[in-house]
Amino acid sequence: MASTWKPAEDYVLQLATLLQNCMSPNPEIRNNAMEAMENFQLQPEFLNYLCYILIEGESDDVLKQHYSLQDLQNNRATAGMLLKNSMLGGNNLIKSNSHDLGYVKSNIIHGLYNSNNNLVSNVTGIVITTLFSTYYRQHRDDPTGLQMLYQLLELTSNGNEPSIKALSKIMEDSAQFFQLEWSGNTKPMEALLDSFFRFISNPNFSPVIRSESVKCINTVIPLQTQSFIVRLDKFLEIIFQLAQNDENDLVRAQICISFSFLLEFRPDKLVSHLDGIVQFMLHLITTVNEEKVAIEACEFLHAFATSPNIPEHILQPYVKDIVPILLSKMVYNEESIVLLEASNDDDAFLEDKDEDIKPIAPRIVKKKEAGNGEDADDNEDDDDDDDDEDGDVDTQWNLRKCSAATLDVMTNILPHQVMDIAFPFLREHLGSDRWFIREATILALGAMAEGGMKYFNDGLPALIPFLVEQLNDKWAPVRKMTCWTLSRFSPWILQDHTEFLIPVLEPIINTLMDKKKDVQEAAISSVAVFIENADSELVETLFYSQLLTSFDKCLKYYKKKNLIILYDAIGRFAEKCALDETAMQIILPPLIEKWALLSDSDKELWPLLECLSCVASSLGERFMPMAPEVYNRAFRILCHCVELEAKSHQDPTIVVPEKDFIITSLDLIDGLVQGLGAHSQDLLFPQGTKDLTILKIMLECLQDPVHEVRQSCFALLGDIVYFFNSELVIGNLEDFLKLIGTEIMHNDDSDGTPAVINAIWALGLISERIDLNTYIIDMSRIILDLFTTNTQIVDSSVMENLSVTIGKMGLTHPEVFSSGAFANDSNWNKWCLSVNALDDVEEKSSAYMGFLKIINLTSTEVTMSNDTIHKIVTGLSSNVEANVFAQEIYTFLMNHSAQISAINFTPDEISFLQQFTS
């Protein structure tokens, strides 16, 4: 039913004025308008007025009298975006049910009728999409939702491109809801699919309509709905026809995506057509001018190679066709060659422009990812360059990179077959007179390094010296790529061929001072990879002084952009080696000098804060003279960011600093705590329990929606509990425990796993040092619920930390685990599996001490298997200070002596047992 609402002219004019003033460059006018807008938002008809200005803003007679055409168009777009924002997030006026939406539902589609104004039609499409995602999903019985879908389909049938674009956005956000019943018990999915099929089958529709329709269908494929499955053969028939006949790039790109989705969800339907599909993709890669299409085709080949649904024997016949084309597309295109040749001059002396510096988020150190409390970066991509196969970290994803990535995965899967085809080709071109051929060849070698390592084995002793020579090549791209490729061979060098380490790493270190910035960047990244992959003893013995001296030179020589990469390398170096007095004298002064020159709002602080965090932690008490100044500034930045964040909830005009300022400040403070230990207590708590500001700030940070903020804050909390007087935390203990519980119970996002790990780790330290008393029942239940769950897959590092924390809780309250959910052989066995691999003696000892207290208190009616007893003895016999809890061990052995005599132990385990039986 059409809305009978009509706007009041004075309100329309008033709102139009506010919209214009909200965009004013004058802050006073803008702020006053924002305040007035907040009052306007309280009116029930607010959304209707915004919609009216969006769709009638250029035809309303009153508005035309007061505004120019340009102002009217700007106002329409502003009204549309405000309408969209008013339906989203914390500003969602729909959920409050206090605002009339009738006019919006009945008339918003009119914004698509006049498609001459692209801005207005695009904004209208966004509003319609938002209306579906925030209102119609929850109100599927509202007939206007179904009516709007049919109107969009009808408009598309008449050639209206904004309508199909709106449908495409709606399908992307809400496709799964169209499987459900809407008004009149109708399931819209069938009508939608039939319409999309009709649009893509008819060549008379525009390329935009055809491509967007395929895009709509692509949102349905992963859902595997019955309505699509029964139409799948029809879709395949149409899509194969399009692949043969439709030469439009927009359509072809979507066809490639369709095949990629089908490969993932219905590979059985593609197997008999793979010859044609692969040839189609190779044809696109080699012939189309639009690189986006070629990238999508190459993405299919990448998916084809990595799909768990495609056995190796099916992929193998295509290697001979795919690999040569991948190699050919790894050469820079003509335009890039011209640009690179024109910019080969030295540029290291030129200052970087701020706009040329890509924002770099801090390298988050997952400090507590292992239960032993040490750094554990297993879940991180240690080699930052692996995401950019050609090392071009400043350019967007392109065909060259996609080809290199595809060659990489194919070499990992079928190394022998790929090498047989690729290596003769590469050997022929290694000495090419054309620099871009040499560069692409070196890129290919790097791309194949991981998978083909053992097949390279015979040739690498000759190949490595050749690559080192290329560090002196006249052309900067060749030198740059050589740095990256040599780093890819670092595992081969470091594991079994250390005789190559000095001949390779010394020239790369020398290349740090290259006169071309791109080469500097590649060299420092390569050095960082070698540091990361090498044993600390190797770095300290062979390269410690040389790296310190080189870092010092680089700190003086590098410009802004490469300093960011350098900070990361120094941070990795500090994590790997125990820095000494020499390091403090060489690299600390320039770091502190740069730190002092940067403003609190400079984004260059992010990597520098992370770097200083690692350096402070490594230097330990030697960092003490600088600690007060460094801490005070980090604390000031942290407080400022948290304060602005809180104020922004009341005042949306406040610009909130990026979360990275909070994360890096927390990490630097934590680095000081780790490095200085108890000596840093007076920094954080200068008045003892009289000033707990840092804890109040941390409580705010632990409620931040960004996982990395909470992750860093839990790490700091754990270290405060570990190093400082426990009385400092007791006053806020209940609040911290509630937030720890919330993290463990409700953070089920895989990206948030490190935050969960740190929360559990912190809880373990708290329970070890502070008697949880009345909180122990609730906290143990939270831990056990996750430990014993069989409804989800628990990350191994999470399980490890859960196990350690159970042990630590058992130190003071073994009774809560000696009966109930934990008290059975299966859980004990699982506990041992998680804890036995720990290397940290202190952590493992405290975990086992608490665990044995629990076991010794458990009723003898609960039987323990020989396998579990064996695992306990295995765990106790290595990396454990048994003398600290010898009585608990003795009691356990006595209680299970009959079973122990029947178990076959290793010599080390027997030696351990003899300590308690002799």
UniProtKB/Swiss-Prot annotation:
It comes from the Eukaryota. Its main location: cytoplasm. HEAT repeats lie at residues 11-38, 43-92, 103-137, 145-181, 190-222, 235-263, 275-303, 320-413, 421-449, 461-488, 501-534, 542-577, 583-620, 628-678, 694-725, 777-814, 825-858, 867-900. Residues 361-395 are annotated as: Disordered. One of its GO terms (molecular function) is nuclear import signal receptor activity. GO terms for biological process: exit from mitosis; mRNA transport; protein import into nucleus. Disulfide bonds: none annotated. Keywords: Cytoplasm, mRNA transport, Nuclear pore complex, Nucleus, Protein transport, Repeat, Translocation, Transport. Residues 372-393 have a biased composition (Acidic residues). SUPFAM superfamilies: ARM repeat (SSF48371). It is found in: Cytoplasm; Nucleus, Nuclear pore complex; Nucleus. Binds to nucleoporin FxFG but not PSFG repeat regions. Present with 2130 molecules/cell in log phase SD medium. Belongs to the importin beta family. Importin beta-2 subfamily. Functions in nuclear protein import as nuclear transport receptor. Serves as receptor for arginine/glycine-rich nuclear localization signals (rg-NLS) and PY-NLS in cargo substrates. Its predominant cargo substrate seems to be mRNA-binding proteins. Required for nuclear transport of NAB2, HRP1/NAB4 and TFG2. Mediates docking of the importin/substrate complex to the nuclear pore complex (NPC) through binding to repeat-containing nucleoporins. The complex is subsequently translocated through the pore by an energy requiring, Ran-dependent mechanism. This is Importin subunit beta-2.
